[in-house]
Amino acid sequence: MKTQNVLLSFGIVFLMISFSSETYIRDFITRRPPFGNIGKRSLKDVESLDFLFDPTFTAADLAVLENALEDY
C-alpha cells in the first residue's frame, strides 16, 4: 500500500510538472532524450514580447509613472 501511494504521488507530480512546463505529449514522446524538456518553458513566441522593452522611456517618464502608481 505504501509503494502504491508513493508511485501514485510520483505520477501525479510528474504529470503536473510536464503540463505546467508547457510540454506537449507529442513533443514529450518524440524528443530525445525523453526527459530533456521537463521544466523548460515554451520559448517559441519570445519575439512577441519585444514590445515590453521601450527604449524611448526616460528617467522623467519613469518618475511620473512611479508617482502615478504610488497609491496602488
Swiss-Prot record:
Main subcellular localisation: secreted
Tissues with expression: Expressed by the venom gland.
Keyword set, alphabetical order: Amidation, Antimicrobial, Antiviral protein, Secreted, Signal
Extent of the signal sequence: 1-23
Modified residues (Isoleucine amide): I38
TM ranges: none
Propeptide: 42-72
Cellular-component GO terms for this entry: extracellular region
Domain of life of the source: Eukaryota
Biological processes annotated in GO: regulation of defense response to virus
Locations listed in the record: Secreted
Protein family per UniProt: Belongs to the non-disulfide-bridged peptide (NDBP) superfamily. Short antimicrobial peptide (group 4) family.
General remark: Shows a low ability to inhibit hepatitis C virus (HCV) infection in Huh7.5.1 cells.
Function: Antimicrobial peptide.
Record's protein name: Peptide Ctri9194
Organism: Chaerilus tricostatus
